């Protein structure tokens, strides 16, 4: 099994047009998104290894925030997760696996975390 590097960003809060109920379809819904991307890596990271041998965390953050279309309504949050995964796969051929966790903040009570985790592998 090849070595991989897991890059992670957690608990990004965004507002996206999503939902199936009438009270959800007109206003952006608050979501908390976490992303993990597994990428191919060199055999070793020397002290002077350039960033190009890895991947910037900013790429993951962008895919889960500014990379999401603001004018598109996603019926399901699974569609939001797929959009994030697709963005990361398209942007870097070294990305092997993407895991996206989305929590719907509008329906959570107290300390609940209600949402989904989608895992996609490069095909």
Predicted regions and their residues:
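N-terminal, polar/charged subdomain of small-to-medium soluble alpha/beta proteins
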Residues: 1-123
């Amino acid at each position: 099994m090849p070595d991989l590097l897991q890059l992670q960003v957690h608990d990004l809060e965004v507002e996206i047009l999503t939902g199936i109920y009438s009270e959800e379809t007109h206003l952006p819904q608050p979501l908390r998104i976490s992303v993990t991307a597994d990428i191919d890596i060199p055999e070793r990271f020397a002290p002077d290894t350039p960033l190009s041998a890895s991947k910037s965390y900013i790429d993951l953050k962008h895919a889960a925030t500014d990379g999401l279309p603001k004018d598109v309504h996603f019926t399901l949050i699974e569609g939001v997760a797929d959009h994030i995964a697709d963005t990361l796969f398209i942007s870097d051929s070294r990305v092997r696996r993407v895991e996206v966790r989305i929590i719907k903040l509008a329906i959570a009570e107290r300390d609940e975390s209600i949402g989904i985790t989608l895992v996609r592998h490069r095909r």
